[in-house]
Regions:
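Boundary at the C-terminal end of the N-terminal hydrophobic targeting segment
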Residues: 19-21
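Bacterial N-terminal signal peptides
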Residues: 7-16
Length: 126
């Protein structure tokens, strides 16, 4: 009887672990789909959508967003959008992204963007 009960408990534990593992997979899958949608949104012409997507990608520290964010930082006409891109690159903190922030300090036409990038760089080195 004890052996039967012990076997039943072990099976229940194994099955419950499998259920939790499948939930994590579903959650990870949802995050990946969300990240994919944000990467699509960052390439649209809609300013609000692009800005929000850039901000969220920085919040989730998406390594896949580094190149699109660098593109925005380098070539966007809107200085607010460039600042959002720089802030997201700072949050992601990849070497390539931080290099782009350093370059913006030197070469961006806007004093405001250069100043914000300098703040992000100084803060990242603390």
């Amino acid at each position: 009887m004890k052996g039967y009960l012990l076997g039943l408990v072990v099976i229940l534990i194994l099955l419950s672990g499998e259920c939790f593992a499948s939930n994590l997979t579903k959650r990870d899958s949802a995050i990946m789909r969300g990240e994919k949608n944000l990467l699509i949104a960052i390439n649209t012409d809609n300013y609000g959508l692009k800005s929000s997507a850039a901000q969220i990608l920085g919040d989730i520290k998406s390594k896949k967003a580094v190149i699109p964010l660098m593109k925005i930082l380098k070539s966007s006409d809107d200085e607010n959008l460039r600042i959002v891109a720089a802030h997201s690159l700072y949050k992601i903190n990849s070497p390539m992204g931080m290099f782009a922030v350093r370059q913006a300090i030197r070469f961006d036409e806007s004093v405001r963007v250069r100043k914000m990038c300098l703040n992000y760089l100084v803060d990242s080195e603390k």
